[in-house]
Amino acid sequence: ASRERKEFYKYPKIIKCEKDYFWRTSLSFIPSQSLLKRLLFQSIKRAHSKSEALSNYLFSIYTYDDPLEINNIFSTSKPQEKSIPLITFNCNKDCNPIEDIHESVIHSHIFIESKALFAVLTGITHWNNYEVGSVYQVRRVPDKFEPTMQAFLNFLSVI
């Protein structure tokens, strides 16, 4: 039998975001915005062919190079209003994912380190690993979970 905890866990005073992830130490370069965009176009084409989304669900991806930038994202209530996305695309299987950016039912804004995005798009890691490890931050408008969007994201890679 287990005992009930009477005291709360003690929170650390500082949460380090400089953890050396495998993808961070494996990549000896910071991927350029143009390289990431080319990989995203290929990945979106691949994921769109497997899409099950029937409505306009949009993703916008924002990248940053400095791992400490995540602190600014955490401390801002609507960071998407202060940033320019690298790309915005539609998950709707009946639309052109790049050209048909209409009013959306849900719009998810993903904030991710450039190296992490490169690693997930090239198969070094997988989106599910990032979700568990809190590697990227998402702001949904409205804040509703849509399973077909998550499924789309799981196929978002070039391999």
Report each predicted region and the residues it spans.
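Feature captures hydrophobic
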Residues: 1-159
